[in-house]
Amino acid sequence: MSDKLIIFDTTLRDGEQSPGASMTREEKIRIAKQLERLKVDVIEAGFAASSNGDYEAIRSIAQVVKDSTICSLARANDKDIARAAEALKPANSFRIHTFIATSALHMEKKLRMTPDQVYEQARLAVRFARQFTDDIEFSPEDGSRSDMDFLCRVLEGVIAEGATTINLPDTVGYAVPEGYADLIRSVRERIPNSDKAVWSVHCHNDLGMAVANSLAAVKLGGARQIECTINGLGERAGNTSLEEVVMAVKTRRDYFNLDVGVDTSQIVPASKLVSQITGFVVQPNKAVVGANAFAHASGIHQDGVLKARDTYEIMRAEDVGWTANKIVLGKLSGRNAFKQRLQELGVELESEAEVNAAFGRFKELADQKAEIFDEDIMAIVSNEAQHDANEHYRFISLSQRSETGERPHARVVFNMDGQEHSGEGEGNGPVDATLHAIESQVNSGAEMVLYSVNAITGGTEAQGEVTVRLSKAGRIVNGVGTDPDIVAASAKAYLAALNKLHDKAVQKINPQI
């Protein structure tokens, strides 16, 4: 059995299914490039047949990412598989991941197919996919609740047809570590051709055991691929956290005896990027990437760490990408210094025009606050990345008036399809007034389901990062805006969310694996 653990990242596919986490093509490309710097083995870039937007995003990622295998999900039918293969064609290395449900409940209620029909369709799907690539992954949806005899029959059949990775998902997060490991081991032992495939796990965190289940399946069940997401992003309670399984295997190599190719110094930058793009703030006590992950409040612990770090730290903060929150630039810093710092932070901008736009925003910010931190620079880049030629709404300016005892009044100027619009509104507070001002011109009909504010750095000069979540006609999107002025950040976030609602290239089919 191999001593290499394959890391399969599905942030861009399964992670995006978290309500409000939908991303634009440009945002997906930025995350894919960071995943490449992280050196994940496989990037599941999306589900090509779900929408034109997902197809184009996968194709764009396949064109720019060269060092990771690019994967697309596909249902077990020729149309989906051909669509996936077409999207993946530009990739240096690609995988088709096809699936069909195998539990009695899913076959009867959802697919309305007999077991024999499912068996045949699974085999034919893998056979068809082999026309395009030798790298085929098969998942029996709801596999952990499937009849063991039937599950083994299906998996033996798809391996015979050429499936090279078999992924056994815990679709509803019901499994427990020992039982899940037993399932993987039992299936492998019962299938005569099991040695011809890599065995993979895909766990959901509904009972808080996704990481534990994945690691148990690796150590006790013989799995050699873990499907995971940055920050554990995903629908319901999320997926297996990439950062946690990677650091568990790295830190406890004495126990797992496995090698992982991930560049762990890129973990925190990846976490911050996904958080900034999706608007999903990482909880402070989150393992590895939380703000308090390496903080010690106890006097005894602090004393121990000062004397010898390994008294209370089992891994080093710098090994996962945490750096000191130092001042890097100021208002007198030039364009070359700014560009150099972007490179040090692992930020790649596509053109000099993008560098110039980001530098212009940096100079504006430097006039407002004396100390510019790395987090400020990352926020600037994220803000600028939201702007593209197809942008429907774009913030220009804001003025507001608020006196004690009077309802606040706001005036917002913004572009809508290239035309400048000015809206005015009143509300219970300055933010409420600002959003009413925007709606006076937009009339979106959207419902706000979340509004949150986060300080990017410490101090009263810190930029505010606002996340707005809107819902309309069954679609839920997030918008993120940053500015030293919280009200302006709110306007930017609201317009960013409206842009995503306006974008028709949104995933329509969201399968659970």
Curated annotation (Swiss-Prot):
Transmembrane spans: none
InterPro entries on file: 2-IPM_HCS-like (IPR050073), 2-isopropylmalate_synth_dimer (IPR013709), AIPM/Hcit_synth_CS (IPR002034), Aldolase_TIM (IPR013785), LeuA/HCS_post-cat (IPR054691), LeuA_allosteric_dom_sf (IPR036230), LeuA_bact_synth (IPR005671), PYR_CT (IPR000891)
Swiss-Prot/TrEMBL cofactor(s): Mn(2+)
Domain Pyruvate carboxyltransferase residues, every copy: 5-268
Pfam families hit by this protein: HCS_D2, HMGL-like, LeuA_dimer
EC number, as in UniProt: 2.3.3.13
Region entry Regulatory domain, spans: 394-513
Top-rank taxon, per record: Bacteria
Biological-process GO terms, alphabetical: L-leucine biosynthetic process
Catalytic activity line of the entry: 3-methyl-2-oxobutanoate + acetyl-CoA + H2O = (2S)-2-isopropylmalate + CoA + H(+)
Enzyme class (EC, first level): transferase
Pathway(s) this gene product operates in, as recorded in its UniProt entry: Amino-acid biosynthesis; L-leucine biosynthesis; L-leucine from 3-methyl-2-oxobutanoate: step 1/4
GO MF term (any one): acetyl-CoA C-acetyltransferase activity
Record keywords: Amino-acid biosynthesis, Branched-chain amino acid biosynthesis, Cytoplasm, Leucine biosynthesis, Manganese, Metal-binding, Transferase
Residues bound to Mn(2+): D14, H202, H204, N239
Subcellular localization(s) per the UniProt record: Cytoplasm
GO terms under cellular component: cytosol
NCBIfam families: leuA_bact, PRK00915.1-3, PRK00915.1-4
Stated role: Catalyzes the condensation of the acetyl group of acetyl-CoA with 3-methyl-2-oxobutanoate (2-ketoisovalerate) to form 3-carboxy-3-hydroxy-4-methylpentanoate (2-isopropylmalate).
UniProt record similarity statement: Belongs to the alpha-IPM synthase/homocitrate synthase family. LeuA type 1 subfamily.
Self-association and partners: Homodimer.
Protein name: 2-isopropylmalate synthase
Lineage per the UniProt record: Bacteria, Pseudomonadati, Pseudomonadota, Betaproteobacteria, Burkholderiales
